């Protein structure tokens, strides 16, 4: 008799990268995960984030980030900052930079063409984006955190729509 067991397919792994991993990339991590959860694909996606620098390793997301997320119905309280490592290339299908400076750093860290091919800018996925860079709200006020979150939501929706066919299991 034919074996009817199925082989589980590994989830699609995305890591979002900003500077300190306390503002932009945690927002993107949470929003992308919520996009997957909203259509029943949460188990098919692993959304993480990291920073190019190590200044905030182990810290929670900036309180203004958590507040902006909460105002839009997201929960970012489980986040702890970490620094991007070379292992992230091997453990990810896609490495999403929040601005061009992060993209340059990541390309410099890429060990080979396979690593480099995984790197993309988040805003490049949003056809309506006025810029390729998500501005750093760290030295700004509440309004900028809300604006940045809105940019991330729009680009994340576009990214998810483009990835969904590859994420959705074939039945």
Task: Tell me what each language-model feature is.
Residues 2-3, 94, 100-171:
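Phosphate-binding/catalytic loops
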Residues 2-91, 161-171:
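Conserved active-site segments centered on acidic
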Residues 18, 69, 96-97, 152:
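Hydrophobic structural packing positions in well-ordered secondary structure
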């Amino acid at each position: 008799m034919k074996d009817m067991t199925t082989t589980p397919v590994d989830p699609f792994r995305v890591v979002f990268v900003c500077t300190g991993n306390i503002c932009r990339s945690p927002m993107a991590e949470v929003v992308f995960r919520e996009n997957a959860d909203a259509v029943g694909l949460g188990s098919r996606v692993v959304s993480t984030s990291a920073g190019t620098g190590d200044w905030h390793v182990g810290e929670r997301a900036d309180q203004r980030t958590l507040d902006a997320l909460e105002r839009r119905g997201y929960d970012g309280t489980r986040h702890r900052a970490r620094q991007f490592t070379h292992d992230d290339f091997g453990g990810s299908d896609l490495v999403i930079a929040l601005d061009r400076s992060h993209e340059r750093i990541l390309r410099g860290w890429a060990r080979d063409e396979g690593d480099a091919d995984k790197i993309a800018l988040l805003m490049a996925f949003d056809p309506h984006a006025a810029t390729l860079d998500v501005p750093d709200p760290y030295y700004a006020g509440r309004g900028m955190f809300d604006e940045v979150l809105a940019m991330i939501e729009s680009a994340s929706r576009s990214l998810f729509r483009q990835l969904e066919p590859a994420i959705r299991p074939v039945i």
